[in-house]
Every structure is written in C-alpha cells, then in structure tokens.
Amino acid sequence: DSVASRGLGDVYKRQDALQGVDIPVFVKNPVNPDLELWMGAMERLNRAGVQRIAAIHRGFSSYEKSMYRNLPMWQIPIELHRRIPQLPIICDPSHMGGKRELIAPLCQQAMDLGFEGLIVESHCNPNAAWSDAKQQVLPAELDAILSKLVVRDEYTTTDDLQNLRAEIDQLDDQLMNLLSKRLRICREIGQYKKEHNLTVLQSNRYSEILDKRGKQGVQYGLSAESVANIFEEIHQESVRQQLKIINS
C-alpha cells in the first residue's frame, strides 16, 4: 500500500484500515517541503501497528522556475535519515525530474546519498503512455540506466578518511568560535541601537553584506545562493538576539 502526497493530512482512515495488517507501506513525501508532516504520517501508522514502513521521496512542489518537475531538496530526506536512521528511503526520479533525460543523473544522486532504492517509470511505448509520458523510459533504457549506476559503500572508512574528518571537526570548532564572537558583537550593536533608539533591521547594511559575501564566496568556489542561505540564517539569529536586547 502507499500513502500519497495529498493524503498525508488525513492518515487516520489509512491508519484504521491498516491496523493489524502485516504489509509494507510506502509513504510519499508531502507536496510542500514539510518534514514534520511527513514524519508525523509515518509515526501515526507505526503507532497503529504498521512495522514495515518506507519513505518515498518524489521531490517538492515550488513556484520557482526549475528544470525539475519537483525540486529534489535533498536536505529534507537527509534530515529524515538523520532522525530515523533505520527507515528505508526510496527515490522516485521519474516524478522528481518529470523528463526522461533527468532520470539517470537523479538516480545516481540518490545512490550517492545512500538511498535504499529507486522507483523508475518504464513503458514499452513511452510516448503513447496515458499519463506522465515525458518521464517514462523504455525497458532497454531503464536497463542501461541501472547498469551504469555506481552504488557506493556507506560505512567503510579508511585512515585517510578519518584524518580528513578530523580536520573538518577542527575547522567546525573554529567556525563555531568565530560565530560566537560575531554574535557577541551583534549583541553589542543591539545595545547601541537600543540606547540610540535605532531599528534592529538595517536593510542597506544587510544587502551590502549579502552582495559582498556572495561575490567573495564565488571566488572561493561556492555558489552565491549557498552563501546567501548561510548569511540569511546568521542574520536571522542576529536579529533575534538584538530584538531580545531592545525589548528587555
């Protein structure tokens, strides 16, 4: 059985119907990127006695223009795996990509991220398929896609890898220390704003930071979007702490 994306908000009927039935149940992700809703549906089924549950990642709807039918947003299934490590997560690259030429690279990305399986739509005559024709492949094409997949080992580690991870741990410690110092200065700025009756949000300054650090990030091989996301999170925490000071 499967619980579809649009049915996640009403799992109770399925929950009652599946009570005491020993069958595998696949729970598709919600249409919108809502990890708590996805997890909540699986938790309800588990409480009803369903033991064999797997998650199906089909991507998420978005108003953004994208090459994908549904945005992968890999960070959401990655977080799902972190929270429920024993849960099998299966990727549906057909619905995610929406185009047959995107299926192979999405399959490989899913394998690289440690997904337990794939659901790929295949049809003997894809162009004549009654639904989703553009995302279906011939059986021979599916065989070619699967034969070229590289399935990686999740757990085997070497001394070299352990040493590299130790370096990352040290750098993360330094990052946390620097972030702590940055926020301390932000709190001092918040105190200054309170004493001089200034607003917390200084839009021009924030835009200046995003522009400057975005360009700097690109020079270091990072995407401007990733840098913007990082500084947006830092800015939100800075604003939160300054609001606390101003309203104290």
Q: What do the PLM-derived regions correspond to, one by one?
A:
Residues 1-12:
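Single conserved hydrophobic/aromatic residue that forms the stacking wall/gate
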Residues 2, 93, 122, 170-173:
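Generic detector of well-ordered alpha-helical packing
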Residues 10-126, 130-141, 157:
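Catalytic alpha/beta core domains of metabolic enzymes, predominantly
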Residues 17-34, 146, 150, 188-189, ...:
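P-loop/Walker A phosphate-binding loop and immediately adjacent motor/lid segment at beta-alpha junctions
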Residues 98-152, 200-228, 232-236, 244:
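Extended, hydrophobic interaction surfaces within ordered domains
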Residues 154-248:
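Domain-level signature for soluble enzymes in the chorismate/prephenate branch of the shikimate pathway
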